[in-house]
């Protein structure tokens, strides 16, 4: 029993995070030097994301009986994303107004270091609906894979899957090759995941070593408020959605606990994307649904980031005594409904969108971003964890709505009545290429 515990990724990552925190706290200079370990692990994951998405989406779509089902899945997913992310934005707005973590700070924006946020403000200017939509279309297929742009790869994979489906039996050979390639890719993922404890250790040691636990104290009220809000959102909102769908949010969290720990260590929900694709299929969701919902959710369904954006914006207003009446807050909400949809699931992207939102609203001092620049890294863990759980729940919900969910398998896996294989298995749904 003890041997199996020590060998489990869950235990190894948890131990690595604890050691990283201790190293960063007692030997901050050494801890800060551990950054390459975390960066290397995240880069290895990013290396594999594009081919994973391509294989999963292509085999999922090409193996479907009807192309109408793909369109229905996409429409249902986008509707769900819009509803739930809007709820997340509103909850963040309500709680930050009730708790008022920035009240009484009386910060003069003129005294803040505007240069510290100049880089984020410059990147924020490039954000926009048209620019975002145009960026979804890759300049070249190779460029999409080389840059690792999730939405660009997803677009090409969807088109490729449609075209392969139309070939019918003539495309069987191509389908089999991609299916076999998918198995190889997931084999690589299993190898990379053995390095997860090292990556989590390096990232956590760097965070504590560079920023220090002391930086949490001054703005601790905002951090605590944000973490509690994320927990409430997961337990109450996502928990209610899960219960209505027919499963327990707590059992689901236990099922993806290893992925959550990887995200906790790296502060990026993207680091768990490949494993989530595999695990959601093993949970009973059809491969075509998983392939569409998970990658798309990384830009359109980031619940934790949505909560963070409203809370951070209003916090800056409270701290700098910038009055925000109901009209200003509704305007903020509307702007965030648009700007938050272009967020990628990588560390730092939420801060860039926050800068874009504050610039667009015009009522808040952009220099106020300097207030939370130092603690943004500590809040990114809660953002990433909430994003991951939110996308997992979304996949199950959408799969049920479009009737592509194996309820018995879902119940068996979450209740440990069926063994969860260690290696990736190609879904039986994708074994039938329609003529």
Swiss-Prot record:
<keyword id="KW-0812">Transmembrane</keyword>
<feature type="transmembrane region" description="Helical">
    <location>
        <begin position="76"/>
        <end position="96"/>
    </location>
</feature>
<feature type="transmembrane region" description="Helical">
    <location>
        <begin position="352"/>
        <end position="372"/>
    </location>
</feature>
<feature type="transmembrane region" description="Helical">
    <location>
        <begin position="44"/>
        <end position="64"/>
    </location>
</feature>
<dbReference type="GO" id="GO:0070778">
    <property type="term" value="P:L-aspartate transmembrane transport"/>
</dbReference>
<feature type="transmembrane region" description="Helical">
    <location>
        <begin position="4"/>
        <end position="24"/>
    </location>
</feature>
<feature type="transmembrane region" description="Helical">
    <location>
        <begin position="289"/>
        <end position="309"/>
    </location>
</feature>
<dbReference type="GO" id="GO:0015141">
    <property type="term" value="F:succinate transmembrane transporter activity"/>
</dbReference>
<feature type="transmembrane region" description="Helical">
    <location>
        <begin position="142"/>
        <end position="162"/>
    </location>
</feature>
<keyword id="KW-0769">Symport</keyword>
<keyword id="KW-1133">Transmembrane helix</keyword>
<dbReference type="GO" id="GO:0015366">
    <property type="term" value="F:malate:proton symporter activity"/>
</dbReference>
<dbReference type="Pfam" id="PF00375">
    <property type="entry name" value="SDF"/>
</dbReference>
<comment type="function">
    <text>Responsible for the transport of dicarboxylates such as succinate, fumarate, and malate from the periplasm across the membrane.</text>
</comment>
<dbReference type="InterPro" id="IPR036458">
    <property type="entry name" value="Na:dicarbo_symporter_sf"/>
</dbReference>
<dbReference type="GO" id="GO:0005886">
    <property type="term" value="C:plasma membrane"/>
</dbReference>
<feature type="transmembrane region" description="Helical">
    <location>
        <begin position="222"/>
        <end position="242"/>
    </location>
</feature>
<keyword id="KW-0472">Membrane</keyword>
<feature type="transmembrane region" description="Helical">
    <location>
        <begin position="326"/>
        <end position="346"/>
    </location>
</feature>
<dbReference type="InterPro" id="IPR001991">
    <property type="entry name" value="Na-dicarboxylate_symporter"/>
</dbReference>
<dbReference type="GO" id="GO:0015138">
    <property type="term" value="F:fumarate transmembrane transporter activity"/>
</dbReference>
<keyword id="KW-0813">Transport</keyword>
<dbReference type="InterPro" id="IPR018107">
    <property type="entry name" value="Na-dicarboxylate_symporter_CS"/>
</dbReference>
<keyword id="KW-1003">Cell membrane</keyword>
<comment type="similarity">
    <text>Belongs to the dicarboxylate/amino acid:cation symporter (DAACS) (TC 2.A.23) family.</text>
</comment>
<keyword id="KW-0997">Cell inner membrane</keyword>
<protein>
    <recommendedName>
        <fullName>C4-dicarboxylate transport protein</fullName>
    </recommendedName>
</protein>
<feature type="transmembrane region" description="Helical">
    <location>
        <begin position="184"/>
        <end position="204"/>
    </location>
</feature>
<dbReference type="InterPro" id="IPR023954">
    <property type="entry name" value="C4_dicarb_transport"/>
</dbReference>
């Amino acid at each position: 029993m003890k041997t199996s515990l020590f060998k489990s990724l869950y235990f190894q990552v948890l131990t690595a995070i604890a050691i990283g925190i201790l190293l960063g706290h007692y030997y901050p200079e050494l801890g800060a030097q551990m950054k390459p370990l975390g960066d290397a692990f995240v880069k290895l994951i990013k290396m594999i994301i594009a081919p994973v998405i391509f294989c999963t989406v292509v085999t999922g779509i090409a193996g479907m009986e009807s192309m109408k089902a793909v369109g229905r899945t996409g429409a249902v997913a986008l509707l769900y994303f819009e509803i739930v992310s809007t709820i997340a934005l509103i909850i963040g707005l309500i709680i930050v107004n009730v708790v008022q973590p920035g009240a009484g700070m009386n910060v003069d924006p003129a005294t803040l270091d505007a240069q510290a946020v100049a880089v984020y403000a410059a990147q924020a200017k490039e954000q926009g609906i048209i620019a975002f939509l145009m960026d979804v279309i890759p300049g070249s297929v190779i460029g999409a894979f080389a840059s690792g742009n999730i939405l660009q790869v997803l677009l090409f994979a969807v088109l490729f899957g449609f075209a392969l489906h139309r070939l019918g039996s003539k495309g069987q050979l191509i389908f089999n090759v991609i299916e076999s390639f998918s198995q190889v890719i997931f084999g690589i993922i299993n190898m990379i995941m053995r390095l997860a404890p090292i990556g989590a250790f390096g990232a956590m040691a760097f965070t504590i070593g560079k920023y220090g636990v002391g930086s949490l104290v001054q703005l601790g009220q905002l951090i605590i408020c944000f973490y509690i809000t994320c927990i409430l959102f997961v337990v109450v909102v996502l928990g209610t959605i899960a219960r209505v769908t027919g499963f327990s949010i707590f059992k689901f969290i236990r099922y993806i606990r290893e992925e959550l720990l990887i995200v906790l260590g790296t502060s990026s929900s993207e680091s768990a994307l490949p494993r989530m694709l595999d695990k959601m299929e093993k949970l009973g969701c059809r491969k075509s649904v998983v392939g569409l919902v998970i990658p798309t959710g990384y830009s359109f369904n980031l619940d934790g980031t949505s909560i963070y954006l409203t809370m951070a914006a209003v916090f800056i207003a409270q701290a700098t005594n910038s009055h925000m009446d109901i009209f200003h807050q509704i305007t903020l909400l509307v702007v965030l409904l648009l700007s938050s949809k272009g967020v990628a699931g990588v560390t730092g992207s939420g801060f860039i969108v926050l800068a874009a939102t504050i610039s667009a609203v015009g009522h808040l001092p952009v220099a106020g971003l300097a207030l939370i620049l130092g603690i943004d890294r500590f809040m990114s863990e809660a953002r990433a964890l909430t994003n991951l759980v939110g996308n997992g729940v979304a996949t199950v919900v959408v799969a049920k709505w479009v009737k592509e969910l194996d309820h018995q398998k879902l119940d068996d896996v979450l209740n440990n009545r069926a063994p969860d294989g260690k290696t990736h298995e190609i879904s039986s749904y994708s074994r039938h290429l329609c003529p």
